[in-house]
UniProtKB/Swiss-Prot annotation:
<feature type="binding site">
    <location>
        <begin position="118"/>
        <end position="121"/>
    </location>
    <ligand>
        <name>ATP</name>
    </ligand>
</feature>
<comment type="function">
    <text>Catalyzes a mechanistically unusual reaction, the ATP-dependent insertion of CO2 between the N7 and N8 nitrogen atoms of 7,8-diaminopelargonic acid (DAPA, also called 7,8-diammoniononanoate) to form a ureido ring.</text>
</comment>
<feature type="binding site">
    <location>
        <position position="57"/>
    </location>
    <ligand>
        <name>ATP</name>
    </ligand>
</feature>
<feature type="active site">
    <location>
        <position position="40"/>
    </location>
</feature>
<comment type="pathway">
    <text>Cofactor biosynthesis; biotin biosynthesis; biotin from 7,8-diaminononanoate: step 1/2.</text>
</comment>
<feature type="binding site">
    <location>
        <position position="19"/>
    </location>
    <ligand>
        <name>Mg(2+)</name>
    </ligand>
</feature>
<keyword id="KW-0479">Metal-binding</keyword>
<dbReference type="Pfam" id="PF13500">
    <property type="entry name" value="AAA_26"/>
</dbReference>
<dbReference type="GO" id="GO:0005524">
    <property type="term" value="F:ATP binding"/>
</dbReference>
<keyword id="KW-0460">Magnesium</keyword>
<dbReference type="GO" id="GO:0000287">
    <property type="term" value="F:magnesium ion binding"/>
</dbReference>
<feature type="binding site">
    <location>
        <begin position="178"/>
        <end position="179"/>
    </location>
    <ligand>
        <name>ATP</name>
    </ligand>
</feature>
<protein>
    <recommendedName>
        <fullName>ATP-dependent dethiobiotin synthetase BioD</fullName>
        <ecNumber>6.3.3.3</ecNumber>
    </recommendedName>
</protein>
<dbReference type="GO" id="GO:0004141">
    <property type="term" value="F:dethiobiotin synthase activity"/>
</dbReference>
<comment type="subunit">
    <text>Homodimer.</text>
</comment>
<keyword id="KW-0436">Ligase</keyword>
<feature type="binding site">
    <location>
        <position position="118"/>
    </location>
    <ligand>
        <name>Mg(2+)</name>
    </ligand>
</feature>
Length: 225
């Protein structure tokens, strides 16, 4: 096994395709002959399936991983209600413990060449009264890959997120443009504006293809380095 490498995958917003991109990156790593595991530290919204509470994002990451490391490590906190995690956690009487997440992450990192840790929602989503996903990325000490959902308003969202990443002392390892809105006007011009303003490599552009599979899209992406 090569030296383990891991990244924190953040997004400019919710519903911009982070999980799809995370799965594609896992497939890209596996295509290059590396073992790869996905992780969703906190997920909100789950269904009772085959005797376990299962979040859809976590299920997709598990399917794209080289092997199943167990949901207790892949998704340490699976909250049932599809609302902001700190609200769901409070309603369910759950306190999100960063130490538990870190232990699960270290277990994954010891088992694979590549670990992709997917955040929840945008970059700064509360996980408790004084703890958010940006704090989690900093605590894990991971460089960040930013997924930009290409739609109207994405330039401001992306640049503000880039500033927030830098403000936390984190490294932006690269960014990925996800064409989530096929009707977006001047999409290429928006992409070029982002390319000129983000001081990090563009790791790929995910095309908008109905019914696309992450394994197919993997060819359009690369991991940093």
């Amino acid at each position: 096994m090569t030296e383990p490498r891991a990244w924190f995958l953040a997004g400019t917003d919710t519903e911009i395709g982070k999980t799809f991109v995370a799965c594609a990156l896992l497939h890209a790593a596996r295509r290059d002959g590396r073992s790869a595991l996905g992780m969703k530290p906190v997920a909100a919204g789950a269904e009772w399936i085959a005797g376990e509470w299962l979040n859809e994002d976590a299920a997709q990451l598990r399917a794209a991983s080289s092997f199943d490391p167990g949901l207790d490590r892949l998704n340490p906190y699976c909250l049932k209600t599809p609302v902001a995690p700190h609200i769901a956690a409070a309603e369910e009487g759950v306190e999100i413990d960063p130490a538990r997440i870190r232990a699960a992450f270290e277990s994954l990192r010891a088992q694979a060449d590549v670990v992709i840790v997917e955040g929840v929602g945008g970059f700064r989503v509360p996980l408790g009264d004084r703890y958010d996903t940006a704090d989690l990325a900093r605590e894990l000490g991971l460089p960040v890959i930013l997924v930009v959902g290409m739609r109207l308003g994405c330039i401001s969202h992306a640049l503000l997120t880039v500033e927030a990443i830098a403000a936390r002392g984190l490294t932006l390892a690269g960014w990925i443009a996800n064409r989530i809105d096929p009707a977006m006007l001047r999409a290429d011009e928006n992409l070029e504006a982002l390319r000129r303003r983000i001081d990090a490599p563009l790791l790929g552009v995910v095309p908008h293809v109905a019914g696309a599979d992450p394994a197919q899209v993997a060819a359009s992406l690369r991991l940093p380095g």
